Amino acid sequence: MVHGTAVLKSEYDGLGLSVLWVVPNEGTKGVVQISHGMSENKERYLPFMEYLAERGYICVIHDHRGHGGSVHNREELGYLYGGKNKAMVEDLHQITIWIKEIFPDLPVYLLGHSMGTLVARNYLKYFDNELEKLILTGPPCENPAVDLGLLIARTQKRHRGGRYRSKLLETIIFGTFASRFAGEKSRFAWICSDEEVVKAYEESPLCGFTFTADGFEGLLMLLKETYRKEGWRLQNPQLPILFLGGEEDPCIGNGRKFVKELQYMRQVGYRHVTGKLYPGMRHEILNEKDKLTVYRNIYQYLEK
């Protein structure tokens, strides 16, 4: 397989978007575009990308703005450059168009994780006709406190500036996640049951950073727009959509809330929405101890 990288200039504001891809040596079946989660970087998905590439799928991922290589400097990790939710969605779509220009005859599948599912679902409102299938892992559930969070983010942004790192919002949003695993060593224990994965995440300068007020505003706008019933163009109601999560993932809430996420997409008008929860797994099911089971399930879904 062949690995490659590039930097594309965002059509939204000119920010450099760092892109990584893996291409099979032969027999390409399609392209899997990946939309990663909050406070992480694209390279964490390489094992999964290589697994799919070995089975005939090209994989492409870019660092969302404010992440990995899509920043002017590392001091701006967690800063969205004032682009809010709109820029992240437009960036994702720009990468899709770029993929289609290079591989015009191949179907494009989109996989989003965590915050990346919010970007993907916002994208879906406008561009569902670009995709063959959509897969969502660790999808955040609806949160009734989203407006309060937005008020805090905007107040902090106004008084302290967009680059101010909001420990308050970090605690409000993620404090309860950590408290579910309070007996474990790391405050990031909620992301994965594999301590080595958590340790690597904690030690990486590209992971676990606190979002800025500007970043939290964008994140919360993504969350709010995901669950706003207005604005869905529904150009492709036949699009197959698969929700996947870990039963012990506090981000999806619980089994009942997970089912509500599926039901919501059906209410919007999508006719082929399915889901699966994995016992014993936490937030990052692609990094869990039994991740190969998840890899296989995703591969089988792509092959259907």
Q: Which residue stretches match the model-derived regions?
A:
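Catalytic active-site module of serine/aspartate enzymes centered on a nucleophile-bearing elbow/loop
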Residues: 268-304
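Alpha/beta-hydrolase-fold enzymes
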Residues: 120-206
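Alpha/beta-hydrolase active-site loop
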Residues: 80-101
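Active-site glycine-rich loops that stabilize anionic/oxyanionic intermediates
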Residues: 32, 36-40, 114, 247-248
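N-terminal cap/lid segment of alpha/beta-hydrolase-fold proteins
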Residues: 1-26
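Conserved alpha/beta-hydrolase
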Residues: 44-75
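Short beta-strand/loop motif that positions the catalytic acidic residue
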Residues: 243-245
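Alpha/beta-hydrolase fold nucleophile elbow
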Residues: 103-114
